[in-house]
Amino acid sequence: MSSTPSNQNIIPLIKKESIVSLFEKGTRQDGRKLTDYRPLSITLNYAKKADGSALVKLGTTMVLAGTKLEIDKPYEDTPNQGNLIVNVELLPLAYETFEPGPPDENAIELARVVDRSLRDSKALDLTKLVIEPGKSVWTVWLDVYVLDYGGNVLDACTLASVAALYNTKVYKVEQDSNGFRVNKNEVVGKLPLNHPVVTVSIAKVDKYLIVDPDLDEESIMDTKVSFSYTPDLKIVGIQKSGKGSMSLQDIDQAENTARLVAVKLLEELKKQLGI
């Protein structure tokens, strides 16, 4: 089974002490402040054969998300909604401990957090993906690939997922004697998205809380908490990872910081998506 870099004790004690000594001065190895995000770039329509796609670079972390739409049956418990299926893969080329094969528990956890953030925020209006109530709907396959693991992959996965959804084309549906079929020659619009959503992760290293940890920082962190926000700053997801603990004061401070960062991140995301 693959293991995430943060599970590997690869940072020598002397290097950890060096990193923490920088935290004491309010700075980090790459020159960022403790509350700074790494540079973000988004390339839309990166995978030309997908219905929508986006390549996200967050520092050295690189994630590609792509969508495919197909006509499908609705789930029995949601006959008047389309379907959203999120998959995440940690490709072996992304990090030395990632192995080929089916998604492991780390990839499954990432997919669940991204899925939950999208659903609970109602970013995608599934009710508008119905073709024939109770019989035919659109299924949106959202596949996310981690190409380079440079730390804080969850935030990058959320950004790539949202960007790919906004980039997705919806094709004309035609009906004949055999039922519904997709006419790929005619685009009728985009997915019915209500708003974007972002995830902001805060790592705790000793007594310090740091935004958007890179690979070295994740390797020495005690724990990490991630908050997902809508543009009105409603929390639509919280995820804790790592073996360490956080006090209520830590969580409160982390959320206050994440909220401020989310405002800037949402502005940057909207700017790069042109929405």
UniProtKB/Swiss-Prot annotation:
Q: Does the keyword Cytoplasm apply?
A: yes
- Judging by the UniProt lineage, the source's domain of life is Archaea
GO CC annotation = cytoplasmic exosome (RNase complex)
Question: What is the predominant subcellular site recorded for this chain?
Answer: cytoplasm
Matching InterPro entries: ExoRNase_PH_dom1, ExoRNase_PH_dom2, ExoRNase_PH_dom2_sf, Exosome_comp_Rrp42_subfam, PNPase/RNase_PH_dom_sf, Ribosomal_Su5_D2-typ_SF, Rrp42_archaea
Which Pfam families does this UniProt record tie to the protein? RNase_PH, RNase_PH_C
Q: Where in the cell is it found?
A: Cytoplasm
UniProt keyword annotations, A-Z: Cytoplasm, Exosome
Record-level GO BP terms: rRNA catabolic process
- Extract the signal peptide range: none
Statement: the UniProt record of this protein carries the keyword Isomerase: no
Q: Name one GO molecular function term.
A: mRNA 3'-UTR AU-rich region binding
Report the family membership: Belongs to the RNase PH family. Rrp42 subfamily.
Q: How does it assemble?
A: Component of the archaeal exosome complex. Forms a hexameric ring-like arrangement composed of 3 Rrp41-Rrp42 heterodimers. The hexameric ring associates with a trimer of Rrp4 and/or Csl4 subunits.
Please explain the role this protein plays, according to its UniProt record. Non-catalytic component of the exosome, which is a complex involved in RNA degradation. Contributes to the structuring of the Rrp41 active site.
Instruction: Name the HAMAP family for this protein.
Output: Exosome_Rrp42 (MF_00622)
Query: What is the protein name given in its UniProt record?
Result: Exosome complex component Rrp42
Gene encoding this chain? rrp42
